[in-house]
Amino acid sequence: SDAWDMDFIGKYWSNSNKEGIAKLLFSRNIDSKGRPEGIGLSMWRVNVGGGSSEQGDASGIPDKYERRVECFLNQDGSYNWSKQAGQQYFMQKAKEYGCESFVLFTNTPPVWYTKNGLAFPTKGASSNQDEDKNNLKDEHYEDFAEFLATVTKHFVDQGYNIPLISPINEPQVDWRKTPGADAEQEGCSYTHEKTKILVTALNDKLEEKGLATNILLGEASRWEPIYTTNSGGYYSNLVDHYFNPDYKNYYNGNEEGKYYLGNLKHVPNILCAHSYHTDKTWSSLKTAREKAYEKAQQFGVELYQTEWSMLSTDYDNYENYDDASYMDLALSMARVLHHDLATANVRSWSYW
């Protein structure tokens, strides 16, 4: 993933330094001593920003260097393709080194489309908590879908292979924050109902523009929402809600297949989750992924792991990241990789 630092590095670091980073990330060459120049990433996730960077301190996000992101869309509806220049630098370098695919993802709609004019929701906008967590105005779902499809087409026309676009990130998380205080990043939650509205609109826009790009669903903040009611009924049981046409429960009004998305042309049978928080112990690594894989298999759904880094505390062998040795960190990542690949049988794995 190019979040959070790649835009800053690509814009402001020296050519030699950022070229060196690109080589380490993307090169597949072997030097004269038989050593690999880089790790040869085959896929690169690109954050499509919502415009908090242009707002400056008014964005309410204190971290101005990493967590504010530019937006290609201007308020008047025109596009500025010179935005996110640092990220585009690394996209170009990835393509030059032979990176096969690019996945676009977004954390928020453009601020022009949000309820509070910010790139994250704030508390109190609605008496309905689930409406409060969602920051996209009802009248702008089609506009947001048009924006995402337009950005996708732009980069496809630039020669990038973009097999997937992910329009929603970690809907289970309550992104409501206090501007200028605890707002850490762009974010927006979507219930199953809101997800279906947005995904259906994006499916239609991708089709209108003649794009082969598909929609990547899920981006669950951990593995449990894939198969159970872990994070609230309006944000969980993703396999059943999106890929089981006969599924009904309290959270879809006992209406069979109310939020089914498996019949949309640009929705493949894929769900993705993040390996955060289920990485502390061998037992949690194994159990959550076994259950996710078992549920996915029932409906022919492939699983992807699309984000992981060390966010947790109370690991088996150490308290937290700062207390860990380099070997502790290496073994923790190896355990996550093992269980994601061998237990969850993921078809794709991405580091945050």
Features from the language model and the residues they span:
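Substrate-binding and catalytic surfaces of secreted/luminal carbohydrate-active proteins
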Residues: 146-159, 163, 174-352
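Short, well-ordered beta-to-alpha junction loops that form the rim of enzyme active sites
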Residues: 106-107, 167-170, 219-220
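N-terminal catalytic cores of secreted or lumenal carbohydrate-active enzymes
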Residues: 1-163, 175, 182-192, 196, ...
